[in-house]
Amino acid sequence: MFQKMVGRLREQEILTDALNSHRSELIAIYGRRRIGKTYLVRTFFDKQIIFSFTGLSNGKRSNQIKNFMLKLNEVTNNFKGDKQPNDWLEAFSYLKIFFKGIKESKKKKVIFIDEFPWVDSHKSGFLFAFENFWNDYCTTRSDLIVVVCGSAASYMVKKIVN
């Protein structure tokens, strides 16, 4: 981990603490575009990322959900024949089903959602469903790290950090 990157020592310490935690962790990373947020997460958690999803710029809710399900189907074939979820609550229920099939262990598993603010368009229901996924499922396990990343700093601070 540390040997792959130069700099970002404080950030690497925070990510290491999450790996060593005895509970699930939610990490929000935000900042201007093109400063290496995604690189930091992908490089540091290279082997631990189990599910990764990047929001679509100006994407409609239906396209965001379709993209989410396509990414989920890249890591499991369990949902290939299923119809596309109607909303984010249903989409996150598929992610729960996927993780319920992975035995809980001391080894951390990372869920990475990049460009998080792009997914939460007006009336999309994404943030509500994400909060439900985190509170209702992730916090009941001790082996998950959920990393959300975004360039819209004001959104990330207002909706995630605070």
Residue ranges and their predicted role:
Residues 1-162:
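Phosphate-binding site recognition
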